Amino acid sequence: MSIASKVYQALAASKPLCRLLHKDRRGCGIYHGRSPDAGSYPILVYSVISDVPALSADGCEMERRVTVRLHILTKDGAYERIEDAARKVMDSLGFRRYQSMELAEKHAFVKIMDFKTGTGVEE
């Protein structure tokens, strides 16, 4: 199973997180890459932004470092509870928060968080 699939399954399975997000016909507002309908908030968008070798031996990649980025989009900037719930999910997957930033767009407030983990190649 890919890292993106594992992240989606864990985020979507989190009832505390899903209760805080907009519901649509597909379920709670969790999307990979981008949101198909940016008019309904709050939503969470995730993507794998980096997957690089971290350890190699005898020309074989033994471990890699993966970075997943979460965007929390809200109309009112109240994303603290969503952030806490998402961090708990990412921590349970072995990811650790690397950096975060806040943006104000024309129609939404955005909280961006990057999470990193190391993983064996065979996983």
Regions found by a protein language model. Name each.
Residues 74-84:
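Charged low-complexity stretches with an acidic bias
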Residues 1-51, 55-56:
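Small/polar-rich, solvent-exposed N-terminal microdomains that initiate assembly or binding
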Residues 52-54, 78, 121-123:
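Residue-level signal for secondary-structure boundary sites
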Residues 62-76, 109-119:
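Oligomerization/assembly interface segments of phage tail-like spikes and tubes
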Residues 49-52, 63-67, 88-92, 118:
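Short, low-complexity, polar/charged sequence segments that are solvent-exposed and flexible
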Residues 83-123:
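Acidic-leaning, charged glycine-interspersed low-complexity segments
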